[in-house]
Amino acid sequence: MFKGSCVALITPFTEDGVNYEELRKLLEWHIKNHTDAILVCGTTGEGSTMTLEEKKEVIKFSVEVVNKRVPVIAGTGTNNTKASIELSKYAEEVGADMVLIITPYYNKTSQKGLYAHFSAINDAINIPIMLYNVPSRTGMNITPLMLDKLADLNNVVAIKEASGDLSQVAKMAELCGDRIAIYSGNDDQIVPILSLGGAGVVSVLANILPEETHNICEKYFLGEVIESRNLQLKYLSLANSLFIETNPIPVKTAMNLMNFNCGPLRLPLCEMEDSNLIILEENLKANGLIK
């Protein structure tokens, strides 16, 4: 387990595949800038448009480069339970520290099926599981009562909570906050979720502000709550600009503007609208990230 900021890392692409040279640079940059954990092949990493072999290679490569300096979390969840088990087993074999398992999307399921999905994955592996709740993308919600039940599974240790509903997060903390670590899945709610006993954030913002996102959490944990809150508010407009279009379109665009060689987005993701690009550039300039 970790406390603090986990970057939901973008995946740098070339026209033909993954840019491993740039990926290595990004991994080292995050460790140097105090990122507390690294998630690969998640939503921000465009995992849904990577091939199975690409995901396996990125997980293996990242584990080897990071070499236990910080935890590496592998995004292995899909809407196919069998496929999720296969990739989770692979992540365990190559030394990932945790897997991130999203709720089934598109085909979705019932609450009974949701429990069966996570339970089957839990029983097939021996590695910590972080659940991922993002109803806006999946059409499914892990309710507080369901989380209370899932928290009893032996490998389920955490949840990335991106419902945006602080009342729901509070109920989760009340029911099972002593058995499961709750991480904010939204950069605009880091401090509010920390105030409910949260353990940190799985962050898009950390792709461009790794140390600052770490500091929001670190200062809170040190009891410097006002300083933590001030940082949350300082970067609020920038964080919001990263969601002006579908994530990870803005953050990958931002990183390329910042002279990281992150390459293209994969269809169906595409270049930003000019009007939104102007807003993103203004926020990057305001924070000294581009000239």
Swiss-Prot record:
Catalytic reaction(s) noted: L-aspartate 4-semialdehyde + pyruvate = (2S,4S)-4-hydroxy-2,3,4,5-tetrahydrodipicolinate + H2O + H(+)
GO terms, biological process: diaminopimelate biosynthetic process; lysine biosynthetic process via diaminopimelate
Subunit structure: Homotetramer; dimer of dimers.
Gene3D superfamilies: Aldolase class I
SUPFAM superfamilies xrefs: Aldolase
HAMAP family with a match to the protein in the record: DapA
Keyword presence, Calcium: no
One GO cellular component term: cytosol
Keyword Kinase on entry: no
Annotated site residue numbers, Part of a proton relay during catalysis: T43, Y106
Function: Catalyzes the condensation of (S)-aspartate-beta-semialdehyde [(S)-ASA] and pyruvate to 4-hydroxy-tetrahydrodipicolinate (HTPA).
MF term (GO), any: 4-hydroxy-tetrahydrodipicolinate synthase activity
Active site, per annotation: Y132, K160
Source organism of this protein record: Clostridium perfringens (strain 13 / Type A)
Keywords recorded for this protein, A-Z: Amino-acid biosynthesis, Cytoplasm, Diaminopimelate biosynthesis, Lyase, Lysine biosynthesis, Schiff base
PROSITE patterns: DHDPS_1, DHDPS_2
Pathway linked to the protein: Amino-acid biosynthesis; L-lysine biosynthesis via DAP pathway; (S)-tetrahydrodipicolinate from L-aspartate: step 3/4
Protein name: 4-hydroxy-tetrahydrodipicolinate synthase
Family as reported in the entry's similarity comment: Belongs to the DapA family.
EC number(s) per entry: 4.3.3.7
Domain of life (superkingdom): Bacteria
Location(s) in or outside the cell: Cytoplasm
Binding residue positions for pyruvate: T44, V202
